[in-house]
Amino acid sequence: MRLACCSLASTIILIYPKHMPTKITREAALRYHEEGRPGKIAIIPTKPYATAYDLSLAYSPGVAEPCLAIAERPADAYRYTSKGNLVGVISNGTAVLGLGNIGAEASKPVMEGKALLFKIYSGIDAFDIEVDATDPEAFISAVKAISPTFGAINLEDIKAPECFEIERRLKAELPIPVMHDDQHGTAIISGAGLVNALELAGKSIGDVRIVISGAGAAAIACARLYCALGAKHEHIVMTDSKGVIRASRTDLNEMKREFATTDEGLTTLQEALVGADVFVGLSKGGMVTGEMVKTMADRPIIFALANPTPEISYEEAKAACPEVLMSTGRTDYPNQINNVLAFPYIFRGALDTHATAINGEMELAATRAIAALAKQPVPDYVCQAYGAKELAFGPEYFIPKPVDHRLIVEVSTAVARAAIESGVARHTITDWEAYAEHLTSLLG
């Protein structure tokens, strides 16, 4: 069963139609975006505007007072404007998932979609900003120039390796959180899945061998987060289109060099998988065969995340090794790794503490909170949304479902606490019970 989400202001309504189409056609997708008011987002006033007095407060002359207050104390922008609940979803359209470099304007539907997800899952308002600049310096300058508008910035669909430098620079030069979700969202969700899959497999993260297929933005971020969780750097082997990333190769950029192996005996993905405990696919479909799975360690963990066709299908992996612990990026198989489990709540916690950054401590807190939620009893409405009688922690359920309303409280709270404890918060939350109630209210 599939579900549709409709948003009325900040209220989420989950609809479970009995006869909802399952195939997404070109005609249906274009009609969805065109019907009624074109696009997927709009701006709604939050203050009264019915009388002349209301309008005089909203604009001239009343608006001068908050302007003067902010000029005197810039932090008051969080008090008198929407900045504290506003994220910029910013892209240049150079690496749009499944579409590639389609350019800034063509990426707008994707960025609007991201803004919609921010709203319905965490109550965050988001503006999509498409920047027509492929040069990193020009892009960085544009984002810095408009940054006072936002409480945080979500970078989206920017190609590697430029995305690394763009994010690094903006993090260093702006006083608000900046996160490239294509990197860190995937890392956080797969990290949560890895923690739980290892527990089910009875293995320690410090002992396992991990093979990552792909060496782009998400792959590098995943490898870094796994190391932060306890994986050993020397136990990670990364591959790209030319095979294993070895230290002797002369065609490696700085990011790939970070995870280059000194084992010169490994040259292919097939060789790397022999005896490996974990495979994380962030490359393209059909890279792994059932025979390759059979050469992996006992109770292997396979995260085949290429979309729409994974590196190996769920059915083929299970046929090769019934005890495999499997995740994909697809909704129609168990343990979907979906960034929507993370980014709405990471930004929620960051905004609510007026954080100056989203740091490693906050990312790890989100990872552990998501992993912990999968071990709790699953509400009936979540089971019903997926046509399941019951969902319980185990091989078929070790990552929470995106429709689980508890995510906003569990993950946002963990991120907010980490922001405060790590020293990047400019606003401290003291009543955590009231904060949890507030978070729940954002979902109606």
List where the protein language model places each region:
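Cysteine-centered motifs
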Residues: 5-6
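N-terminal ligand-binding/catalytic initiation module
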Residues: 20-178, 412, 417-426, 438-444
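Solvent-exposed alpha-helices and their adjacent loops that cap or buttress functional pockets
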Residues: 78-83, 119-120, 145-147, 171-172, ...
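Glycine-rich phosphate/diphosphate-binding loop of Rossmann-like nucleotide-binding domains
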Residues: 97, 102-122, 174, 180, ...
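General beta-strand structural signal in soluble alpha/beta enzymes
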Residues: 128, 154-157, 178-181, 212, ...
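Adenosine-phosphate binding glycine-rich loop
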Residues: 181, 201, 304-429
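Rossmann-like adenosine-cofactor binding region
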Residues: 257-325, 330-332
